[in-house]
């Protein structure tokens, strides 16, 4: 089986052009950075998710984007009672958890998304200034692989996902794509269509030479015999969080 990951195309003259997603997708919105709320709103309009689930503090992003989730999950340490009442009055269900729990709010929201049996889950606001939270959310990608559901982290600038088989990236020439071995060694790695190609390579933790590669012609092929690769793909060539976008 071959997986295809499509990048969002950014054109200065006409804004963002994106493919219409035909698979069943569920959005999970967490409380980290996601960039311009308009990007989330546009993606909700084009991807037509089957449901939007909020992890506690992610409600502020949804409020800014004008989106009402079907469900809010968490310990409510970032969502005051007034906002909880606001969402409940609009038909949103809230599942409240104690603060003393083993799961993060984002993980709880992801589990609710899995119950809907989607083909894909897009987790918004999963990255940001809290490195520990970002690492926790990256680790959640493994649960998607275990269930056969494609899970990715996404914001205005990039998406992050795991690769465990031949994968075709459809995007735009010049897009930065970084690849890292995840949870051990990745063997038999072959990259085609990238500025820096590889043939039957072994990638190991502690040797991050897969950082800052680039798509050459808008299409790259990633193959591996064993292990997992963590992919980080930036949508706009040369544009990264915290940098000017003129």
Which residue ranges define each predicted feature?
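Short, Lys/Arg-enriched N-terminal segments with co-localized hydrophobic residues
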Residues: 9-21
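Short Gly/Thr/Asp-enriched flexible loops that form oxyanion-binding sites at enzyme active sites
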Residues: 132-142
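Short phosphate-binding loop-to-helix
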Residues: 94-116
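General beta-strand structural signal in soluble alpha/beta enzymes
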Residues: 29, 53-56, 74, 95-96, ...
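Long, charged alpha-helical interface segments
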Residues: 158, 163-246
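Hydrophobic alpha-helical signal peptides and transmembrane signal-/tail-anchor segments
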Residues: 1-9
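N-terminal beta-strand-loop-alpha-helix module at the start
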Residues: 22-87
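Short, acidic/small-residue loops that bind anionic groups at enzyme active sites
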Residues: 143-159
């Amino acid at each position: 089986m071959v997986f295809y990951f499509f990048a969002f195309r950014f054109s200065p003259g006409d804004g963002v052009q994106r493919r219409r997603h035909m698979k069943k997708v569920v959005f999970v919105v967490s409380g980290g950075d996601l960039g311009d709320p308009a990007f989330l709103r546009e993606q909700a309009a084009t991807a037509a998710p089957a449901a939007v689930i909020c992890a506690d503090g992610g409600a502020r992003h949804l409020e800014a984007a004008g989106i009402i989730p079907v469900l809010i999950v968490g310990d409510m340490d970032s969502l005051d009672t007034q906002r909880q009442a606001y969402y409940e009055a609009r038909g949103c269900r809230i599942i409240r958890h104690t603060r003393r729990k083993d799961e993060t709010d984002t993980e709880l929201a992801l589990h609710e998304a899995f119950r809907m049996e989607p083909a894909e889950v897009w987790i918004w606001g999963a990255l940001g200034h809290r490195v520990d939270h970002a690492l926790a959310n990256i680790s959640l990608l493994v649960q998607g692989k275990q269930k056969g559901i494609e899970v990715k982290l996404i914001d205005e600038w990039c998406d992050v996902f795991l690769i465990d088989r031949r994968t075709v990236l459809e995007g735009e020439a010049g897009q930065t794509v970084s690849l890292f071995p995840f949870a051990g060694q990745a063997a038999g790695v072959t990259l085609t269509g990238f500025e820096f190609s590889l043939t039957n390579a072994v990638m190991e933790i502690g040797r991050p030479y897969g950082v800052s590669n680039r798509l050459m012609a808008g299409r790259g092929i990633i193959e591996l015999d064993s292990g997992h690769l963590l992919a980080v793909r930036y949508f706009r060539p040369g544009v990264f969080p915290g940098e000017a976008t003129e």
